[in-house]
């Protein structure tokens, strides 16, 4: 099984969630063994999508270095991961990925336009060998060994519109497109108003998020799925876990997880070589792990 990249450059424009200004996004092919690289064209600085470059996880996942950063990367990374793309250059002229419609479907459309091609180098994957768990009170995220990766997520909110929701997603590109990619980010009106007063979430609107006001959903079209909220949490998790630097072969489980817990999980997993094995998918190994990339 070979490494992949996109076959041609594609461009898009969208609004930044926090500043509310137009942002140009360019996806470019990249050679083998380069991974996922962000490039800030306005600063001339670049950095890889990997745990050591994560600098903030408060409201979104942020990667960067002393020369600059990029925020709200998880939706784009979720699409890239689900399409099995190993190497890609993400060019931005601002400090955040455009929010698009609050889901990953716009990024999937860009990847469809670009196409995916194989490179000469064999694909590398991170195979989970031991259970690794990170907790914060009753909240937790964990990974366990499995050759047929699944994401099992449970959320619990006091708000009756969300309540308690659980969903199990069997990882594949087809399943991602059908079950996860269209699930939008969500928030509460009171929180949005507070963020706006702080100069944040200025690009947030009913066009790019599900907004909840006490006991009702403000979006006139309603939800895309009955359990869209927990599906979006899985979307986020797929993006956050892709920061491992190679596709993960293992099961992911979360209860009331977060970007912060996901980041701590990737760090914990990679902190001990007994937790995982970096496997090169030559012809023999590709057959062994074929189900993980169906």
Curated annotation (Swiss-Prot):
Family the entry assigns: Belongs to the LpxC family.
Active site residues of this protein: 259 (proton donor)
Signal peptide (UniProt feature, chain positions): none
Annotated residues for binding of Zn(2+): 75, 232, 236
Family matches, as Pfam families: LpxC
Enzyme superclass (EC): hydrolase
Catalytic activity: a UDP-3-O-[(3R)-3-hydroxyacyl]-N-acetyl-alpha-D-glucosamine + H2O = a UDP-3-O-[(3R)-3-hydroxyacyl]-alpha-D-glucosamine + acetate
Keyword Lipid biosynthesis among UniProt keywords: yes
Cofactor requirement: Zn(2+)
Any GO BP annotation: lipid A biosynthetic process
Pathway: Glycolipid biosynthesis; lipid IV(A) biosynthesis; lipid IV(A) from (3R)-3-hydroxytetradecanoyl-[acyl-carrier-protein] and UDP-N-acetyl-alpha-D-glucosamine: step 2/6
Protein known as: UDP-3-O-acyl-N-acetylglucosamine deacetylase
Function summary: Catalyzes the hydrolysis of UDP-3-O-myristoyl-N-acetylglucosamine to form UDP-3-O-myristoylglucosamine and acetate, the committed step in lipid A biosynthesis.
Keywords: Hydrolase, Lipid A biosynthesis, Lipid biosynthesis, Lipid metabolism, Metal-binding, Zinc
GO cellular component: membrane
Entry EC no(s): 3.5.1.108
One MF annotation (Gene Ontology) recorded for this entry: UDP-3-O-acyl-N-acetylglucosamine deacetylase activity
PANTHER family per record: UDP-3-O-ACYL-N-ACETYLGLUCOSAMINE DEACETYLASE 1, MITOCHONDRIAL-RELATED
């Amino acid at each position: 099984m070979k490494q992949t990249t996109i076959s041609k450059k594609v461009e898009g424009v969208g609004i930044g969630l926090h500043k509310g200004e137009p942002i140009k996004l360019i996806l470019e092919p990249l050679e083998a063994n380069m991974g996922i690289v962000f490039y800030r064209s306005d600063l001339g600085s670049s950095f890889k999508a990997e745990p050591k470059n994560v600098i903030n996880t408060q409201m979104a996942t942020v990667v960067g270095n002393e020369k600059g950063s990029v925020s709200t990367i998880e939706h784009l990374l979720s699409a890239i991961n689900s399409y099995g793309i190993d190497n890609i250059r993400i060019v931005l002229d601002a400090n955040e990925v455009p929010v698009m419609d609050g889901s990953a479907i716009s990024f999937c459309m860009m990847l469809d336009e670009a196409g995916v091609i194989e490179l000469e180098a064999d694909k590398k994957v991170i195979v989970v060998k031991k259970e690794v768990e990170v907790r914060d009170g009753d909240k937790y995220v964990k990974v366990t060994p499995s050759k047929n990766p699944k994401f099992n997520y449970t959320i619990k909110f006091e708000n009756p519109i969300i309540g308690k929701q659980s969903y199990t997603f069997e990882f594949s590109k087809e399943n991602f497109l059908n079950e996860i990619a269209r699930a939008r980010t969500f928030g509460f009106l009171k929180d949005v108003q507070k963020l706006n007063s702080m100069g944040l979430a200025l690009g947030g609107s009913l066009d790019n998020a599900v907004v909840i006001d006490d006991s009702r959903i403000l979006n006139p079209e309603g939800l895309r799925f009955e359990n869209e909220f927990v599906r979006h949490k899985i979307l986020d998790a797929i993006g956050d876990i892709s920061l491992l630097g190679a596709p993960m072969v293992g099961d992911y489980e979360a209860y009331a997880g977060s970007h912060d817990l996901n980041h701590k999980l990737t760090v914990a997993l990679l902190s001990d070589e007994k937790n995982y094995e970096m496997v090169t998918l030559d012809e023999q190994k590709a057959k062994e792990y074929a189900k993980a990339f169906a």
